[in-house]
Amino acid sequence: MMASILLTLFRRTKKKYKRHTDDQASNNQVPKTGQEHGRTSCRAPVENMNRLRGECLRMMEVLKEEMWRIYPVLLPQMELLDKECQTPELGQKTQMTYNWTQWLQTLYTMIMEENVPDMDLLQALREGGVITCQEHTMGMYVLYLIQRCCPMLPKLQFLKKLGKLI
């Protein structure tokens, strides 16, 4: 239940802050005098944008493949951490609505849906009261592990921060 709520919030955040990728200002430029008609000055940026789009798609596919490979390795570790969260005297789990395994599954699902998770989104969820401070720390740790195991994720996060991720 909590995982689906969190994924929905991530999707809304992505839609809300999605940037328009076409360069409308350069498409409306009038050709300068001395320039051939039929060739506009925005041709190079459009070609660069298409190349960037293709590169982003390639990087996303590589990230999905890396995540697909590392998920079976990380899952038993997260399950082990869930078991260690039990209190020794009562034998019950501590009160949390979101555990290690759920964080891994949520971040895995986001990556497979081509959403790039980052620390800023986790911080926004904590500040919005959606997750607790402890859950935020757990999510940051799981995201950090994924970043260490999937070298393409930090590159895509950097492009996202620059507003260049398509």
Curated annotation (Swiss-Prot):
The source's superkingdom equals: Viruses
**Biological processes annotated in GO:** symbiont-mediated suppression of host innate immune response
**Ribonucleoprotein as UniProt keyword:** no
Q: Which Pfam families match?
A: C_Hendra (PF16821)
What segment(s) does the record annotate as region Disordered?
17-42
The protein's UniProt keywords, in alphabetical order, are: Host-virus interaction, Inhibition of host innate immune response by virus, Interferon antiviral system evasion, Viral immunoevasion
Q: What's the further remark here?
A: The P/V/C gene has two overlapping open reading frames. One encodes the P/V/W proteins and the other the C protein.
Q: What is known about what this protein does?
A: May counteract the cellular interferon antiviral system.
Per its record, how is this protein called by name? Protein C
